Amino acid sequence: MKANKKNNTAEGNLNSNGLKTGGEPLTTVGDVMTRHVITMSPHHSFSEAITLMATHSFRHFLVVDKANRLVGVVSDRDILRMLARTPNLHGTSVSQFMSRDLITVTPNTRLSHAVGKMLSKRINCLPVVDDTKNLCGIITSTDFLKTFRSMQESAENQAESPKSPHKPHSKI
């Protein structure tokens, strides 16, 4: 298991939730994605996959090759399906049960397009890759909820801030 520290996405000031601040609208996946992703190799064991999910409270993780190219995704549903089908999973590697039919986005993908993909495919995460399929990050339903919360809090704070008294224009 390794932490992917690659960070080639949008720049700017980040708030405590890791979301951009400073007046720029959050419009792309790169603005809100999780950049520091813990990944696994296709050769890791089923047991290691379960340990990773339990330790980090993940519902899914990304599988990359030695060159950091995305090769698969494992979800908690994939693990449950494997457990239902095969009672003894000793010796089973991640490559035997990871999803290979990958639905991805790039850091420049518009948020509305990413949400549409997640809703239409009924998935809870999208791996974020560059043009050569190198992993840049992940965007999850939790990332969207954090973004929404941050936007709501910002709107509420603006609504609650004292407004400067309006002075009528005087005619000369």
Tell me the role of every PLM-derived stretch.
Residues M1-I172:
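Tandem CBS (Cystathionine beta-synthase) repeat/Bateman regulatory domains
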